């Protein structure tokens, strides 16, 4: 990235200059600008990883819920499986768990780790016991991250190129589209004013980060064992607000009224979830690579 555009190199090795008033990085988890400028910060609390594959002939419900995604908690309550029916009688099945449980102690046999997790989780085992695995195993480590900056002079990052949150509540598409919407408004406004500064292009980021933090809080509460069922039973007047949060109403301060009564139900000694950057020095947080291992064994 350079002033007024960027330098690119094609698959044929030929380099070229591309002129642009604003460079918008929507490169997904490749996060080209985030990696170039060493902006990535890993979540200090959601230190998780995932292993997944695809199965043909796995159990599928019928009727109106045939394509519904399922979340199945592991018996130790430290992790969960996703179970996502897809086309061609295929189901995506993946386990999300603490990093050390999946990869600690030099564990590199991802198939064995996945199968052990399945054996411990009857709700998953019975659904895939008669299925055929259609692919190898995909692996990603430490996958909750965010960029220190959403913009610079002449550039913006959005979607997974900005950040990724543990997908427990399937917030990824919502957050990607919202960041794109907000960034687009800032870019259009900036171009009209002749202002493509960092401040102008990233004016949307503080409010967006606040919204991510609300969803992150719900995810962390889940992993911490908090019972939203008991909470709603005790505070039926907040049922609608909790529902609003879970379905993505993350960008309105009115939803913050749930946190004080939620914390009042904590057991003695439990503290509120620390802020995103708490406890993770920036030099450590930016050293790790976001590894995605695909079935051929390559890093992507």
Model-based region annotation:
Residues 185-300:
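C-terminal helical "tail/cap" subdomain of flavin- and related membrane-associated enzymes
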Residues 101-186, 192-203:
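FAD/FMN-dependent oxidoreductases across multiple families
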Residues 1-126:
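Predominantly flavin-linked oxidoreductase catalytic cores and closely associated redox partners
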Residues 26, 77, 92, 152, ...:
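Short glycine/serine/threonine-biased micro-segments
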Residues 68-74, 97, 117, 128-132, ...:
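A general structural signal for short secondary-structure boundary/capping elements
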Residues 33-40, 94-102, 170-173, 234-253:
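Short secondary-structure transition/capping segments
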Residues 22, 52, 80-82, 137, ...:
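Tryptophan-centered motif/residue detector
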